[in-house]
């Protein structure tokens, strides 16, 4: 039997499809999400409905974003869900989550078993809508969850860690083995909860500046900051900001990155 076929659907590699089939894991995730009637619940990549069903049975209505036309068509005729679902057949990377929140008149509760091939860019897309999101629960590669929760000094601390923690409180929920999926992925998975900060702890004036600094620093993570960010800061400027010029990117805190971004935003040559 072809292990890429589940419930008559052939898992498409280009969409990174791995279908969740372990009922204990499914129930545990639904319990962690704890959806309540009247909330604006949205699922990204519902697939064959493994999570849609236990969440949907508690809701009067919910929204799903599904790129695969065959899976979207199956959901349209799902006996228990079809009257509850608003189906958006679209790439989640192009969805305006702010508009969806406005339409519902409340912040979104977003969840999904995210395709591993788009999970990181999709997280960055969602971070730009955190003012329209109440919380997010995602199944991701365990390695990605480790990066999301990592702190300074960890080898897994990187740009994703900084940007995620700038916007959200990041809470690991559950580890999931490959055997919970069909077809089984080659990596371990984990569920993470991201709760946007009600008030950003270390606000930056220009988020693009924070993105630029973290990209540049972590792209050259083996170098000291005086070298990787040498075109942006002098040794004296870094010292004045309370940052050791001889340290590396992974040893600088989120607060310190925000301090650097704000200082850079104030420089006349950066105003254009």
UniProtKB/Swiss-Prot annotation:
This protein's GO CC annotations: cytosol
Assigned protein family: Belongs to the class I-like SAM-binding methyltransferase superfamily. rRNA adenine N(6)-methyltransferase family. RsmA subfamily.
Reaction(s) catalysed (UniProt annotation): adenosine(1518)/adenosine(1519) in 16S rRNA + 4 S-adenosyl-L-methionine = N(6)-dimethyladenosine(1518)/N(6)-dimethyladenosine(1519) in 16S rRNA + 4 S-adenosyl-L-homocysteine + 4 H(+)
Cellular localisation: Cytoplasm
InterPro entries: KsgA/Erm, rRNA_Ade_diMease-like_C, rRNA_Ade_Mease_Trfase_CS, rRNA_Ade_methylase_Trfase_N, rRNA_adenine_dimethylase, SAM-dependent_MTases_sf
GO molecular function annotation: 16S rRNA (adenine(1518)-N(6)/adenine(1519)-N(6))-dimethyltransferase activity; RNA binding
Function: Specifically dimethylates two adjacent adenosines (A1518 and A1519) in the loop of a conserved hairpin near the 3'-end of 16S rRNA in the 30S particle. May play a critical role in biogenesis of 30S subunits.
Name of the protein in its database record: Ribosomal RNA small subunit methyltransferase A
PANTHER family: DIMETHYLADENOSINE TRANSFERASE, DIMETHYLADENOSINE TRANSFERASE-RELATED
Gene: rsmA
HAMAP family from the UniProt entry: 16SrRNA_methyltr_A (MF_00607)
Top EC class for this record: transferase
Gene3D superfamilies assigned to the protein according to its UniProt record, in alphabetical order: Ribosomal RNA adenine dimethylase-like, domain 2 (1.10.8.100), Vaccinia Virus protein VP39 (3.40.50.150)
Binding site residues for S-adenosyl-L-methionine: 18, 20, 45, 66, 91, 113
Keyword terms, alphabetized: Cytoplasm, Methyltransferase, RNA-binding, rRNA processing, S-adenosyl-L-methionine, Transferase
Keyword S-adenosyl-L-methionine: yes
Documented EC number(s): 2.1.1.182
Native organism: Photorhabdus laumondii subsp. laumondii (strain DSM 15139 / CIP 105565 / TT01)
């Amino acid at each position: 039997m072809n292990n890429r076929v589940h419930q008559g659907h052939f898992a498409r590699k280009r969409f990174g499809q791995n279908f969740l089939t372990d009922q204990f894991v499914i129930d545990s995730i639904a319990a962690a999400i704890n959806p309540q009637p009247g909330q604006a619940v949205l699922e990204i990549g519902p697939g064959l409905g493994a999570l849609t069903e236990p969440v949907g049975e508690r809701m009067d209505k919910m929204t799903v974003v599904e790129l695969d036309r065959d899976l979207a068509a199956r959901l349209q005729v799902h006996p228990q869900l079809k009257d509850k679902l608003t189906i958006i057949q679209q790439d989640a990377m192009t969805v305006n989550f702010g508009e969806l929140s406005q339409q519902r008149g409340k912040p979104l509760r977003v969840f999904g078993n995210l395709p591993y091939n788009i999970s990181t860019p999709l997280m960055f897309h969602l971070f730009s809508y955190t003012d329209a999101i109440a919380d997010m629960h995602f199944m991701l590669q365990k390695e990605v969850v480790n990066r999301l929760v990592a702190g300074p000094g960890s080898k897994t601390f990187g740009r994703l860690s900084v940007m995620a923690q700038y916007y959200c409180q990041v809470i690991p929920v559950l580890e999931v083995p490959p055997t919970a999926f069909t077809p089984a992925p080659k990596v371990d998975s984990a569920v993470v909860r991201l709760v946007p900060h009600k008030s950003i702890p270390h606000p930056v004036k220009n988020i693009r500046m924070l993105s630029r600094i973290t990209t540049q620093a972590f792209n050259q993570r083996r170098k000291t900051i005086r070298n990787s960010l040498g075109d942006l800061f002098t040794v004296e400027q870094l010292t004045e900001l309370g940052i050791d010029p001889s340290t590396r990117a992974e040893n600088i805190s989120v607060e310190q990155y925000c301090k650097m971004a704000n200082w850079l935003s104030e420089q006349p040559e950066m105003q254009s």
